[in-house]
């Protein structure tokens, strides 16, 4: 509302303006009369000739001043809270935080998938070209990975409740999305040059032959991995191989998909459809790559279990020795004494299990570290080194299992599993020097293990939820379900409730990775 004093000033100004206008109106009238008389022989003063133009100028200025005062008063009334007869311009509401959060999560998933599939196809390009030719693409991928790692770190901090202020959290989401956009643009910028390097559309026959050779090699490796898994099931408790228990069957599904796609690529090539042949060979490459990831994960699990079994006795001995060294001070502290008694009970139970038959050495190591590790002493000491070695081994095994699951189910796994995996890797990569901070190194290794196991849990839940509605043909037919859940082909939007496979992903960011489209691709419908 305009204050009374200002309203009075505006009225006074308007009154003065009215008087001035009346005065100059009469002056102009008089001048005109005198001028008329002068033309009829009455002498006139030449200075009177200036009165008319000056009067006009003054009147115009007065009108402009009045209009300005009126406009200023109207604007003030409109923008002042409570101003009468006017309403403020509507301000668009801020985007809800949950919407921004969902968008940032989606950007992380899309960027992570783009980085993964770019790395996959870059490996095929390395096999076909020299290091100099793939140099620019390696650099782009390295930059994208760096941006993505920062985005995942920000996501992990948000998930941990940092920062607490919503405005600051919005800023973190904005930076996270910007990092993902930057990573994607970096890969997108190299997509055309990468296609020229591989020249799949010009010469798909060469890539088909290479994929067929890789397929034959993977068939042999999958058979060997199956024998490894059979041995693990016989030698250890079921929990020891549980993270990779289904990997052999999934690897076989990928090989079935590769066979189908290679046949389709050959047929397209014979028909002169090189674009379709190139798209089909990319599907085959993706399937072969994932079969290799699954088979390798089984072999790595076997090696990790064997190493954990070797480390378990020295780990138990290190804990026993350390507890004995501090027996005197433990007896003086009843609360600490109770904790140590529980730790000794765990050690005895682990020894009994390991000598009674099939057991899980990785799980046994974790139990020892969780219950006895806090009181077992300095990991920098020679006998305490077994603590850190066991913790690092457990973390690496958990990271391997989670990464293999995410890498082979990219179409189903969401943001949370990927974020925890990235956090686990960061903890393991930044282990403090054991000479200066041995307890910190042990703590980081155990944190990495916990985060990786959480990542695997989330990934398994995501895959189960993805498959819950059901797809015609089942989950293990090497067809549309395998291709979609694995991210070997991208999902194409459909209006009839179906999941329609689109093209295979390739090197590039979210804007370019879906540039290939095989014709007559299979269609997966939701089960009724």
Model regions and ranges:
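Long, charged/polar, soluble alpha-helical segments
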Residues: 1-528
